[in-house]
Amino acid sequence: QGIRQENTLLLLSQAGTIRVIPMSDCAVRMICTRSDEQENCKFDQSRKACAVQWTFTDDDQSIFMRLANLTIKIDKKSASISYYKPDGTCLLKERDRDSRTMESFQSYRVEQAGRIEHIQTADGVKTFVKDAVRVPDKQLYHTRMHFEWQDGEALYGLGQHEEGILNLRGHCVYLHQANRKIAIPLLVSSLGYGILMNTASTMIF
């Protein structure tokens, strides 16, 4: 089900909620949450985003959101999302089956620090807290997205890597800060689009 709420498109299903926020006439922000937890998700919505003009249509099979230079198609059966140029050329498509998953887990915080150990590593001396007392903190999620890349498409970005890889297609990349490795969760395609991930966590491509 698609609902226009202020200047966002709210997509509701039994699996979860997706809020689509137009940031410009060719860029959107997607916020995915479980069930009705969307209200607890904070986001900034600038005046520029509020000025973006868009329309949406809803039929038996699909929901379409149309901006001046971007069309988004949501398949009702699979909940997969596709992105198109105004001329109908496909930019990016999620796979039809289990396009995104969210697995909840319990996080913990340190209530009382234990003994401190200083250990020499390849990245220098690291400080580790041993035997700390942990208490439950927040309910967080392991998230996963599945895309169908196009033939001949090259993917670049995700930061500075020690492996010297330019085109990331067919390679596994771990995004974390260590030594000379600098993680930047921005993926750029040779087809002219980009994906910026904002999960405040480590990531595996």
Protein language model regions, located:
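N-terminal accessory segment at the very beginning of proteins
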Residues: 1-205
